Amino acid sequence: MLLTSVLLLSCVGCAQDGRKEPDAEKADLGLTAEVKPATDFTAKANAAVYDELDFDDKQEYEFATRGLIDAPETLELKDEDGTILWSQEAYAFLDDYEKAPDSVNPSLWENTKNNHAYGLFEVTDGIYQVRGYDMANLTVVKGNTGWIVFDTLMSVECSQAAMQLIEKNLGKFPVKAVIISHSHADHFGGIAGVMTKEDKADETLSIEDQLASGKIPVITPVGFTEHSVKENVYAGKGMGRRSNYQYGILLTPGVTGKLAQGIGMGQSTGTVSFLTPSYEITQSGEKLTIDGVE
């Protein structure tokens, strides 16, 4: 009873010691949820980057835009309810500035402009990429009779839109195989936009028999399913929290908000799908011939 009384008195003393509540202290410092312009310190730090890097070197942008075949004037993908799942239109403000605003690191600004280059591109003869339709790229290789698809983006809606762009410009051909490079969701989550579960080849067959069956082999590195679970289930929450701080994912796109995430504009928020592989690559350098392509 005595201990309880002492604790109560201690708490009363804490409330009456003259210190302000945390929210009041933040308000005095100007720490509110409203977007603010760059401080002088931030503006000077960002401006100094122009002296550190050669911004006249446009090679990265030339690489990002070379081989463009087609791109819609605007790109914004929505679900049936009108919810935006992926948007390049949200970054149209990039065209309003000749150089980075003082609120943005110039290197990040250039990276964002590079990632804003979206559409269907020819990489080389017979190899094409859809870029800027999700965090990753969707690549197709032309075989004798159809497409070999490398990586299927994060969301079904995005991969469907990517395949439609390919079909519009290059013709409609069957998918002969899907190859997933690794276990990050932005490389496999859109697989249901490329093929169905019923399309998948029988994993009990040899890869040669799978290819001959008329079904679609799903080819991955060994351990793909295990690592997909470990990374996206076990570590997913921690990775998500880290990326919120790292990239400002919850911010609105803008010069005082969210910009690119290095390898892409960010992750789409559509339907994520998954298929187990029908064939796993177990050794580096293993060679397969798929639809006439080695």
Question: Language-model segments: which ranges?
Answer:
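Metallo-beta-lactamase
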Residues: 122, 212-215, 219, 223-294
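N-terminal pre-domain segments of enzymes
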Residues: 19-112, 116
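Active-site metal-binding motif and surrounding structural segment of the metallo-beta-lactamase
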Residues: 145-146, 156-217
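C-terminal motif of bacterial Sec signal peptides marking the signal peptidase cleavage site
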Residues: 10-13
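Bacterial N-terminal signal peptides that target proteins for export
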Residues: 1-2
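Bacterial signal peptide processing site
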Residues: 15-17
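Active-site metal-binding loops of divalent metal-dependent hydrolases
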Residues: 152-153, 183, 223
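Conserved beta-strand hairpin/beta-sheet module of binuclear metal-dependent hydrolase folds
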Residues: 113-173
